[in-house]
Amino acid sequence: GKPDCAMFTAFEKKFTAVNEKLGKKQYLVSYYMSSHPGSTLKEAICLAEYMRDHHIQPEQVQDFYPTPGTRATCMYYTGYDPLTLKKVYVPKSYEEKAMQRALLQYRNPANHELVRKALLRGGRADLIGYGPHALVPPASSDGKRRKNKPADKPGRGARRR
């Protein structure tokens, strides 16, 4: 499996501190992979929340594809972690892989419908809306994307006399 987000955050802090100490301007370029063996919708939703909270907006996300000779490939084909012999969930359906990928790019309006579907399936309807923790806006009643007009925003409506 992959390390959790806390490990990445610790690495990022150490990386930044070392570069500041050395007077270097180097940046981390993260590589995101969706549908990795062991990743359920729950984990993909948690990663989307982490990305939201850390202002991470990946332009490119790669779906997991088995590569010969790797532990992840063994998990993909067998459904077991070869080191622990514990069963591992492996997302294989086109629909779930698409939802996991969309979650990592939840800010892209083209992904909103799939993200809403994933959030509902994952029991996280609380992340649909307009609040600070929402990942996507609700669907409009006609199924089309809603665009906020100035009058839709608080304090921007028609003046009352």
Kindly give the residue locations of the regions a language model identified.
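Conserved AdoMet/S-adenosylmethionine-binding subsite of the radical SAM
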Residues: 1-63
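Intrinsically disordered or highly flexible coil/loop and linker segments, enriched in small
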Residues: 17, 21-25, 57, 70, ...
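Flexible loop/turn segments at secondary-structure boundaries
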Residues: 35-41, 67-73, 136-137
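Active-site/pore-lining binding-face segments in mid-to-C-terminal subdomains
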Residues: 50, 56-68, 78-89
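Radical SAM enzyme core and accessory elements
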Residues: 71-161
